[in-house]
From Swiss-Prot:
Organism from which the protein derives: Acidothermus cellulolyticus (strain ATCC 43068 / DSM 8971 / 11B)
GO CC annotations, alphabetized: plasma membrane; proton-transporting ATP synthase complex
PANTHER family found in the cross-reference section: ATP SYNTHASE SUBUNIT A, CHLOROPLASTIC (PTHR42823:SF3)
Predominant cellular place of this UniProt entry's protein: membrane
InterPro entries recorded: ATP_syn_F0_a_bact/chloroplast (IPR045082), ATP_synth_F0_asu (IPR000568), ATP_synth_F0_asu_AS (IPR023011), F0_ATP_A_sf (IPR035908)
Stated name of the protein: ATP synthase subunit a
Compartments, as annotated in UniProt: Cell membrane
Gene name, Swiss-Prot/TrEMBL: atpB
Protein role: Key component of the proton channel; it plays a direct role in the translocation of protons across the membrane.
Pfam families the record matches: ATP-synt_A
Length: 271
């Protein structure tokens, strides 16, 4: 048999992006992604119920205090840095998204074999795109209610009418960039884990654990970026105040002080 006729043998072979699938209702379901995302969701709901129970007891827990501190800090940072006052529901929603995405990212870091027993659900584009749509679609609905139809349509033509196609593309790109940014970073971590798993066992432990530490940090950063962009998108779409409100309050204060200032009396007269 000649060399050309010999079968091509790979030194290593890594399956990337494969999922455990099942057929149901004529659709293909990634049941591993569904399982891990449900696990993260159950943990988030459990934390919420626990904080609600401690709030009813009259003695707030450390977790509740931390959550309230995060919400207050987020609102304050957005208002002070950008002059935008976000709607009250935005910061709690962003913090909840942060915790959920963080748990989804960290599930893939849990010690396991190759392939992972519990792969990170955020390494599946279906979940990240769903999360992005969950953020963007309600944002447009809330923006339409806050601004009204006329003002909502008019903001696509700002600052000039020629910017209309650019503004439309920008809005269409928001869910895509949100989804791809999170997916790409977490998926690349899964690729690294798969490649490290091919190393000999006697040297695998060191790079594997070093990468898991890096992966933990990447999970935090990506969850934070997703939550931060959520806040910024809603801040611009549902802002109830900002510089305009501050100026209005300042003008109101000046006018009230002018009204309250006493009229000058003729010389020699006192009140």
């Amino acid at each position: 048999m000649t060399l050309a006729a010999q079968p091509h043998v790979l030194a290593v072979e890594v399956d990337i992006g494969t999922h455990e699938t099942a057929k149901f209702l004529g659709l293909t379901w990634h049941w591993d992604t569904i399982l891990t995302s449900v696990i993260a969701g159950v943990i988030v709901v459990g934390l919420g119920l626990y904080m609600r129970w401690t709030a009813r007891s009259g003695v707030p827990s450390k977790m509740q205090l931390l959550f309230e501190m995060l919400v207050s800090w987020v609102n304050r940072q957005v208002e002070e840095s950008m002059g935008l006052r976000v709607a009250p529901f935005v910061a709690p929603m962003a913090v909840t998204l942060f915790v959920y995405i963080l748990l989804c990212n960290w599930i893939g870091v849990l010690p396991s074999g190759h392939p992972e027993h519990l792969p990170a659900p955020t390494a599946d584009i279906n979940l990240t795109l769903t999360l992005a749509l969950v953020v963007i679609v309600p944002m447009h609905i809330v923006s339409l209610k806050r601004r009204g139809l006329g003002r909502y349509i008019r903001h696509y033509f700002e600052p000039y009418k020629i910017f209309f196609p650019i503004n439309v593309v920008e809005e269409l790109a928001k869910p895509i960039t949100l989804a791809l940014r999170l997916f790409g970073n977490i998926f690349s971590g899964a690729i690294m884990v798969s490649l490290l798993a091919l190393m000999p066992p006697y040297v695998l432990w060191l790079p594997q654990w070093l990468w898991k530490l890096i992966d933990l940090g990447v999970g935090v950063i990506q969850a934070f970026i997703f939550a931060l962009l959520t806040i910024l998108y809603y801040a611009f779409a549902t802002a109830t105040g900002g510089h305009g409100a501050s100026d209005e309050h300042a003008d109101g204060g000046d006018s009230s002080s002018r009204q309250a200032s006493p009229t000058p009396l003729p010389a020699g007269q006192v009140r």
